[in-house]
């Protein structure tokens, strides 16, 4: 009987101690919350968190832009080299650029002479693709397609280059005779020529070809063009391309030279583990129409597929808080997703 009384008495003492402490703790939390709300501290904390996110994304964007800009100068240098090769070849044979649209052997020889410059461009610029596309007029055209002669080389791993040979480089597009001459293998997605149609985006070729005429007062080295991810054939892997017009000494544009970066290469520069949880990712997008509506080109992080659908709109005119924009699903704002430019 005494033991039972002691147990009840013990419980009573514990309750007398714990209940006031619990009430005191709740009061402290309530007072703290009220102080935070009244003083505006929550707003400052939210703003600080947003600023951290904006700073992180801005730093990463600057890094990616710097990386891409670093890869443009070698393209211009290669264009100058190929222009010299072309002029030298034309002078040797007493012909003009008109032969590009009349003689397939002229195209082949010019591409063979330029092939070493493309291999060098892949190596020193650490890119996946290097290519030349010539303006061959209607020489290769079919009844349904516009066709151009060219040479397109690809190294699927831009950061591991062979120092002794070019066995790690494959030909994506070009004459098989050139592949034999160069000593490189044909890729499984190989095509002999570039077929230009509505199935893929070929702005990497068409825009630089028109740039000299559209911007006659611009220096040639300012006519380079970054395009989005595109394929050179229906089965080829996509790459983001930078192209530069090939311009003769008399100002005639006779083709383009360019580089390409595959998705996996760029993803190495936008790692999802920059963030400490799985509720964020990086997105590279483009404003194609110049209207503030961005089209996603590439993303990192698994959260993307859960937040973004075909109806999602990236609009710089959308509601934002401290530079963080809400995603819109069609005309409605997404309640649980946001992005920073």
Which residue stretches match the model-derived regions?
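N-terminal Lys/Arg-rich, disordered targeting/topogenic segments
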Residues: 1-10
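Juxtamembrane extracytoplasmic/periplasmic/luminal helical "stalk" adjacent to the first N-terminal
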Residues: 9-109, 126-128
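Short regulatory alpha-helical segment in sensory/regulatory domains of signaling proteins that mediates
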Residues: 83, 116-125, 234, 271-277
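Well-ordered, non-membrane alpha-helical segments in soluble/globular domains
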Residues: 104-117, 201-208
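Extracytoplasmic ligand-binding sensor domains of the Cache superfamily
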Residues: 112-142, 284-311
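Low-complexity, serine/threonine/proline-enriched polar segments
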Residues: 151-210, 299, 309-331
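Extracytoplasmic/periplasmic ligand-binding sensor regions of membrane-associated signaling proteins
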Residues: 170-258
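Intrinsic low-complexity, intrinsically disordered coil/linker regions enriched in small/polar
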Residues: 264-341
């Amino acid at each position: 009987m005494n033991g039972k009384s002691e147990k009840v008495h013990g419980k009573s003492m514990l309750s007398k101690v714990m209940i006031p402490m619990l009430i005191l703790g709740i009061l402290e939390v309530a007072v703290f919350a009220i102080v935070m709300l009244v003083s505006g501290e929550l707003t400052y904390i939210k703003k600080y968190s947003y600023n951290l996110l904006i700073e992180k994304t801005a730093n990463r964007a600057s890094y990616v832009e710097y990386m891409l800009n670093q890869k443009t100068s070698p393209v211009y240098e290669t264009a100058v080299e190929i222009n010299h090769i072309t002029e030298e070849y034309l002078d040797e044979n007493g012909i003009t650029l008109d032969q590009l649209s009349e003689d397939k052997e002229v195209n082949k020889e010019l591409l063979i002479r330029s092939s070493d410059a493309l291999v060098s461009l892949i190596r020193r610029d650490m890119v996946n693709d290097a290519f030349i596309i010539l303006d061959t007029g209607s020489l290769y055209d079919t009844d349904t397609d516009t066709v151009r002669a060219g040479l397109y080389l690809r190294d699927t791993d831009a950061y591991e280059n062979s120092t002794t040979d070019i066995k790690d480089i494959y030909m994506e597009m070009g004459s098989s005779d050139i592949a034999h001459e160069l000593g490189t293998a044909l890729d499984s997605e190989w095509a002999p020529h570039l077929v230009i149609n509505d199935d893929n985006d070929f702005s990497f070729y068409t825009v630089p070809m028109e740039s000299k005429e559209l911007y006659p007062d611009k220096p040639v080295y300012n006519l380079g063009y970054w395009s989005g991810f595109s394929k050179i054939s229906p089965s080829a892997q996509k790459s983001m391309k930078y192209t530069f017009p090939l311009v003769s000494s008399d100002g005639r544009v006779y083709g383009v030279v360019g580089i390409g970066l595959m998705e996996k290469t760029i993803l190495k520069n936008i790692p999802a583990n920059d963030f400490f949880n799985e509720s964020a990712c990086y997105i590279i997008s483009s404003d194609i129409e110049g209207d503030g509506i961005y089209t996603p080109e590439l993303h990192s992080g698994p959260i993307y597929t859960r937040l973004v659908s075909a109806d999602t709109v990236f609009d710089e005119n959308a509601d934002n808080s401290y530079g963080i924009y809400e995603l819109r699903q069609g005309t409605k704002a997404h309640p649980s997703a946001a992005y920073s430019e």
